């Protein structure tokens, strides 16, 4: 399979995963489907971290690599600051009492609040991967060094979920072997059946358990099979969203919060799926709209390091 085809499959995978993330950040919908939320939370962010670890390019020079990390850190810092300030004023589950400049810095630098922890984790793990790559040893020892540093960091004041870091490491380890992502994760719908069996037992609904790890693997295989079987237009749509997953990740929380205003008008649907569809449209179109405005105002290079989003 060509690198272009593999890239489209990874973009498709990211597109599906970002929609799942948005869907289960809708408080109304997740409360209606708590078990589905548990199942999705078992695999969607671990799968994202696997892909991120696989795609990180540690062969760049330190200068090039730090620039790449900076353009993840800048939108993260802006939105994490905004989220923390909003959480100090709004009656949300992550409400912050007595916000001070020191507490704000703590949330941005050490202990992220809300949905932006993934970007924080990406920067930390990316820097660890690059530092390990710089060691004058073989790949096995570099990966071992990454494990040690990740364990140490996870025990420090700097928030880093060790299970999440291990999924990033797994993706990076796969990349160092030179094995194609789609060879290690074969696209097969046969993965759906064992996934469903594992999901039936609540003890497996934890990414840090062996059952949870197998569910992550099977979910990726299943989604890659869905990519292969999708029509061209649907595949292009999800790939389009996958290429803009950072934009959607950064701005969608604004719209998942705003979607609450739809609840009274859609309460007649006991499943919440109408609310889900309309909220996803709002979040996706709204986020892409913000990206368009940032492009037109020439702000994108200052926030994302790109002329167009």
PLM region descriptions:
Residues 1-309:
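Alpha-helical transmembrane segments and their immediate juxtamembrane cytosolic regions
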């Amino acid at each position: 399979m060509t690198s272009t085809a593999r890239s489209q499959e990874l973009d498709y995978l990211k597109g599906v995963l970002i929609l799942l993330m948005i869907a289960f950040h809708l408080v109304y919908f997740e409360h209606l489907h708590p078990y589905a939320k548990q199942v999705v939370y078992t695999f969607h962010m671990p799968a994202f971290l696997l892909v991120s670890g696989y795609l990180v390019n540690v062969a760049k020079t330190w200068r090039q690599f730090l620039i790449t990390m900076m353009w993840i850190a800048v939108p993260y810092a802006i939105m994490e600051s905004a989220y923390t300030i909003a959480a100090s004023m709004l009656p949300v589950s992550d409400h912050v009492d007595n916000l001070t400049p020191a507490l704000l810095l703590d949330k941005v630098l050490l202990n992220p609040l809300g949905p932006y922890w993934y970007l924080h984790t990406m920067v930390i793990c990316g820097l660890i991967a690059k530092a390990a790559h710089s060691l004058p040893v073989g790949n096995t020892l570099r990966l071992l060094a990454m494990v040690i540093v990740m364990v140490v960091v996870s025990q420090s004041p700097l928030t880093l979920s060790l299970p999440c870091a291990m999924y990033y490491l797994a993706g990076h380890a796969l990349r160092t072997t030179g094995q194609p992502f789609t060879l290690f994760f074969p696209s097969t719908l046969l993965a759906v059946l064992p996934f469903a069996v594992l999901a039936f037992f609540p003890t497996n609904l934890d990414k840090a358990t062996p059952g949870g790890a197998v569910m992550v693997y099977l979910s990726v295989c299943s989604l890659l099979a869905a990519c292969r079987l999708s029509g061209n237009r649907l595949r292009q749509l999800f790939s389009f969203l996958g290429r803009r997953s950072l934009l959607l990740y950064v701005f969608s929380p604004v719209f998942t919060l705003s979607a609450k205003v739809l609840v009274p008008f859609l309460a007649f649907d006991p499943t919440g799926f109408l609310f889900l569809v309309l909220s996803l449209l709002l979040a996706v179109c709204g986020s892409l709209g913000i990206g368009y405005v940032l492009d037109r105002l020439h702000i994108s290079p200052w926030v994302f390091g790109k002329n167009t989003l």
